[in-house]
Amino acid sequence: YDIRSLMLDGDYLWIGTYAGGIRVINLRTGAVKAYTHSRGIPNTICSNDVLCIYKGRKGEIYVGTSWGLCCYDPVRDNFMTITSIGSMVSVVDIYEDMYNHLWIATSNSGVFSYNTMNAHWKHYQHEREDSTTITSNSVITLFEDTKGTMWFGTNGGGLCSFDAKEKRFIEFDPHNTLLPNKVIYAIEQDQGGDFWVSSNAGIFKINPVTKDHFRQFTINDGLQGNQFIARSSLKSSEGKLYFGGINGFNVFQPEQFVDNKYIPPVYVTDIRLPYQTDEQ
């Protein structure tokens, strides 16, 4: 199986696969139950290409697929397709923020926001001539920082955040002077507030507010490779950061990286001119 997502729900491990639907393992008994899409049977998952599985704050289980979004009904043991976002969207990531908004990231239609308190849906898409819109309709990852701001890593549009008060998106690097790459795979925040972001050009460290503290790490610094995998990251309870890539994964403690601010003095010990002998 091509496993794309894992979600632990008590004693049950939900496994989302590409082309194989969902497998749910009872970790106590080892029993496995399969959920697949069947065109002629109602209330099955909307596609066998399962890209993400997410458990909401109230216990709801959402399943993002290459053909839309559905929600698990534990009473009937089946799935309800959420028609509000349509069936032609590929849902790659789901996250519920601290303000009870469920964010749905898609690879072809921007992002959707669902207010779980009043059941209101909002659709945000990129518009070429409007800098207040999301930077790309191809969204890879969702991330909420410690202040409750939502961030979006995109495929080709770099990194942007959402201003909840102004209802607008803010591009992190509009002049292309900071980020070495516009493909953002995963985002984590360290104890000091800095972001660590994986991309197609290694991992870079940035301060989301002041935009300083920038450092880029590549394969020359010990990374498994310069290319990483979408949404493959983790911050442990100890504060360690994990990032998965195409050749394995890297783990590190961000606080152990200390910038050497000492500028050594320069001494000129020799001067050589081309095509001149020592006597000349």
Predicted regions and their residues:
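Short loop/turn segments that connect beta-strands within beta-propeller blades
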Residues: 26-30, 73-77, 115-119, 163-167, ...
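Residue-level "micro-hotspots" composed of small/polar
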Residues: 2, 39-49, 86-90, 122, ...
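Cyclic-dinucleotide signaling modules
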Residues: 11-14, 34-36, 61, 65, ...
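Beta-propeller domains
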Residues: 98-99, 105-112, 137-148, 152-162
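Residue-level detector of Asp-centered blade-edge/turn motifs that repeat once per structural unit
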Residues: 7-11, 54-58, 96-100, 144-147, ...
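Short, intrinsically disordered, charge-balanced linker/junction segments flanking boundaries
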Residues: 3, 7-8, 12, 31, ...
